[in-house]
Swiss-Prot record:
Taxon lineage: Bacteria, Bacillati, Bacillota, Bacilli, Lactobacillales
Keywords: Lyase, Purine biosynthesis
Gene3D superfamilies: Fumarase/aspartase (C-terminal domain), Fumarase/aspartase (Central domain), Fumarase/aspartase (N-terminal domain)
GO cellular component: cytosol
PROSITE patterns: FUMARATE_LYASES
Family: Belongs to the lyase 1 family. Adenylosuccinate lyase subfamily.
Protein's pathway: Purine metabolism; AMP biosynthesis via de novo pathway; AMP from IMP: step 2/2; Purine metabolism; IMP biosynthesis via de novo pathway; 5-amino-1-(5-phospho-D-ribosyl)imidazole-4-carboxamide from 5-amino-1-(5-phospho-D-ribosyl)imidazole-4-carboxylate: step 2/2
The keyword Kinase is annotated on this UniProt entry: no
Entry EC number(s): 4.3.2.2
Protein name, as recorded: Adenylosuccinate lyase
Species assigned in the record: Streptococcus mutans serotype c (strain ATCC 700610 / UA159)
Xref: Pfam families: ADSL_C (PF10397), Lyase_1 (PF00206)
Catalytic activity annotation: N(6)-(1,2-dicarboxyethyl)-AMP = fumarate + AMP; (2S)-2-[5-amino-1-(5-phospho-beta-D-ribosyl)imidazole-4-carboxamido]succinate = 5-amino-1-(5-phospho-beta-D-ribosyl)imidazole-4-carboxamide + fumarate
Amino acid sequence: MINRYSRPEMANIWSEENKYRAWLEVEILADEAWAELGEIPKEDVAKIREKADFDIDRILEIEQQTRHDVVAFTRAVSETLGEERKWVHFGLTSTDVVDTAYGYLYKQANAIIRKDLDNFLSIIADKAKEHKFTIMMGRTHGVHAEPTTFGLKLATWYSEMKRNIERFEHAAAGVEAGKISGAVGNFANIPPFVEKYVCDKLGIRAQEISTQVLPRDLHAEYFAVLASIATSIERMATEIRGLQKSEQREVEEFFAKGQKGSSAMPHKRNPIGSENMTGLARVIRGHMVTAYENVSLWHERDISHSSAERIIAPDTTILIDYMLNRFGNIVKNLTVFPENMKRNMGSTFGLIFSQRAMLTLIEKGMTREQAYDLVQPKTAQSWDNQVDFKPLLEADPEITSRLSQEEIDEIFNPVYYTKRVDEIFDRIGLGD
């Protein structure tokens, strides 16, 4: 992933140095397991643990000849050892090392993502509580519907991210796995003890059955969950973009002193962070498709998945880490304009209270059809002529014969729409 969208801690996990360190650890742990079984002299394993190392340039040099990165790696490591070098890669096939190391790298990446998710959820919770009763316009189809609160909008984000966290924990466990079962997965040249020993030491699970590779449905699910997280962020970002439009200006991304919004128009303050999230979510969903394409391999294995995973594994985890942190800061520092929200509610002449007017008339004895057919023409008159809805109700004897002035006034009270907010917050775990 390019540096622009990378954070150092996550990027370092996918560095060549860290990858080869993981490979080397798998190799050494496998030898330790063999030694536990009495198949390899423990003194040789001790020498391997002490002296085994690699030089990346040397690996690449050897690979120019071998055209096989694992063979190049094992030969480069062997050059740093004495006679004990014969135990390097003993009983292993390349993917025993690569897939198990991948499981270990995913574990490292997931630890960062887990912290990111927890921090992001906390930011949303704080902002939702802050604006729990900040009344604003609810919109459906882009059209004014009925009042809601900005806190409730944020609460839907909170609930969605909680579900994403649950999905993430399940999917993360799937890819934090290793396999050391040999060339076709039948343990012909290596006992299951070695697999269990290595995986236990790495803190990952041993996959119960494999071919030459771990089953890639595990990875497809994992990348699908990361895509779900990215898409949730995109949904939230799209909301901010919509609410920041000049004619609404209900929220605004923080705009720093000296920041520029356009090379041509000095007045511009664009929601570039949220737009950035939309673009990156598209990339991650594309990687999800690639992960699903990787499931169908020939027989016990081919390497069609390998080239793709060298890209999507680092890029997707790096991007999710970046997105959670950047969008978390956007939400944390978001400027909210309650007065603009109030102003916008009034821009549709009180029509947003039409359902309540209809329901109140039903409560006073009208059928639903009668009430609907009485109210709807007045909404059309209000909208078409750009006049307030309330006076049209007050001028109709059929309505005033059923409703007092106080009851009509109450219909147009936006606070009515906040009466269940506490209950909803309690239901999703955001109650005080």
